[in-house]
């Protein structure tokens, strides 16, 4: 039997662009309309209108927390112009969670940017942290009394990799120099946002909230045990998994470490150049591991290993995303069970874990992969928007009810 603390958080996550629908003022929407992206998000899951029904289902599944994101382009549709209607909408969303006993975990940036911000250079703009801070201040002032957990930036390294290394996400650039600049701007934005949020709560005489980032972490393993591969594994784990965390800790701006974990990355270098060390991977053709529908290896032991790499920082950890896209729901339940077992292994070794948030609550728009990948605990019929709870969700509901697997 695998047991969890009585105060453990159980929940699932969504992000605004992936589920709300109609986010027509963001950079992603413009790229979709221009044909620069293959799939169009459209009405997504209509969560913007149906959020109460979705939260009812989360409560039914014994969740006691829910992670969501605020869509910046809704709050600030034009530079310096803020929408009171949208601030009120998100207030209602947060209160709907509170009414159902779900602790909100609020993410302020989850990949998408306002169109006006993008046209000024996006995160490559020198003033980008200042623009972000202005938006953060408005949101936090509006929601402060009802939010204990804030996530400033979701997966900064994933954003960098897809937008500035591979060039498949907006702004579709391929530049190591730009990537370094954007990384620094995201870090400065997080540090300043942390201090701003903490200051707002102090000014309002509210208890200090828990503030962090959501860091995507991969279990890097060498394909062959060559010196070059081992060195690359070390450097990637350091730069991809840990650098943003360490720099945030050095600035005193992490109250916990938010972890998103999905899979491993098998490293096989083909040369000694910088790009080789950053990007070379094994094609995985000889791997006998089971895979999700996107072809990612299912590697539960990697969760324990990345958590153990965080133990030295002596901060609590919150699993903010862990999930599988699959058309076989029994595979989803197997995935969840094995990752929870791996999680307890790290906890029994001294890693303090606050909670487990599955990705995702409902099927959603999976960025450049469209609507094909099915991550949800809840099935969404994209023709009727009908929700159907999957059996894996009901099994996880028993775990969260009893705090044991």
Language-model segment annotations:
Residues 1-35, 39, 59, 79, ...:
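Active-site region of glycoside hydrolase catalytic domains
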